[in-house]
Amino acid sequence: MSLKDRFDRFIDYFTEDEDSTVPYEKGNEPVFTPVNSSQEPDLPMNQPSQSAGAKDSNITRLHARQQELANQSQRSTDKVIIDVRYPRKYEDATEIVDLLAGNESILIDFQYMTEVQARRCLDYLDGACHVLAGNLKKVASTMYLLTPVNVIVNVEDIRLPDEEQNGEFGFDMKRNRVR
């Protein structure tokens, strides 16, 4: 395979397929398409493929959900409730994400998990947080605050002198390098 072929395949990977795009149409304007007698007439490009339509509807629903949560925060004057969770295994993370999807704030304390389990759980929660447009903030060495899009958290960065000595729960979203 030549370098040119590889380069062409690389470019083709990042270009969009014409079938999956929906052309912009102006209302009440006739569209004229010339048809050659030697070619068969193409199917109309107005119909997106099934997978593209499903993706667009999922994105639309996600944006609608984010707007709904933002509007609720502006008009609600109710008290805010923060759920406190002490996960003991990785499977508890799905319950925490369900609470976040229900527009609740969750304080998560990983003191009953091993460091490896807690990192794995944090990775899962961080991914769900990005999908649901939430916020994940570290508030203590083993505690994280997970909030929906309509809650703003301001955490003052305080370094306690004995916090650095206690390396037992010093896990964070960043990976430690093995030396």
Swiss-Prot record:
The keyword ATP-binding does not apply. GO terms for biological process: division septum assembly; FtsZ-dependent cytokinesis. Belongs to the SepF family. Homodimer. Interacts with FtsZ. The lineage of its organism: Bacteria, Bacillati, Bacillota, Bacilli, Lactobacillales. This is Cell division protein SepF. It comes from the Bacteria. Residues 34-57 have a biased composition (Polar residues). InterPro entries: Cell_div_SepF (IPR023052), Cell_div_SepF/SepF-rel (IPR007561), SepF-like_sf (IPR038594). It is found in: Cytoplasm. Pfam families: SepF. Signal peptide: none annotated. GO terms for cellular component: cytoplasm. Cell division protein that is part of the divisome complex and is recruited early to the Z-ring. Probably stimulates Z-ring formation, perhaps through the cross-linking of FtsZ protofilaments. Its function overlaps with FtsA. Keywords: Cell cycle, Cell division, Cytoplasm, Septation. Residues 18-57 are annotated as: Disordered.
